Amino acid sequence: MMSKLGVLLTICLLLFPLSVLPLDGDQPADQPAERMQDISAEQNPWFDPVKRCCNWPRCNVYLCGPCC
C-alpha cells in the first residue's frame, strides 16, 4: 500500500512540479515599497495642499507625508 502511494506521489510531482506554482514574492502588490510609490502625498485626502502637509490627527509619515 505504501509503495503505491509513493509511486502515485512521484507521478504527481513529475506531472505537476512545485516550481510552476506562483510565489508570493512574484506579485508586485505584495511588496510594500512598490505600493508606497504608487500613492503620492498630494493624492492623499488628508493632505492639506495650502500648507503642503498632513493634518495632525491623520498624520503618518508612511501614509501621507510631512506633518503640520
UniProtKB/Swiss-Prot annotation:
Similarity remark:
Belongs to the conotoxin M superfamily.
Question: Can you list the disulfide-bonded cysteine pairs?
Answer: C53-C68, C54-C64, C59-C67
- What tissue expression does the UniProt record report for this protein? Expressed by the venom duct.
Pfam families documented for this protein: Conotoxin (PF02950)
Superkingdom assignment = Eukaryota
Provide the Gene Ontology terms for cellular component. Answer: extracellular region
Domain comment as written in the entry: The cysteine framework is III (CC-C-C-CC). Classified in the M-2 branch, since 2 residues stand between the fourth and the fifth cysteine residues.
Q: Which molecular function terms from Gene Ontology are attached?
A: ion channel inhibitor activity; toxin activity
Location(s), subcellular? Secreted
Source organism of the structure: Conus regius
Keyword hit for Cell membrane? no
Proregion span(s): 23-52
Entry's transmembrane regions:
none
For this entry, the protein name equals: Conotoxin reg3.14
> What keywords are assigned to this protein?
Cleavage on pair of basic residues, Disulfide bond, Secreted, Signal, Toxin
Signal sequence span is: 1-22
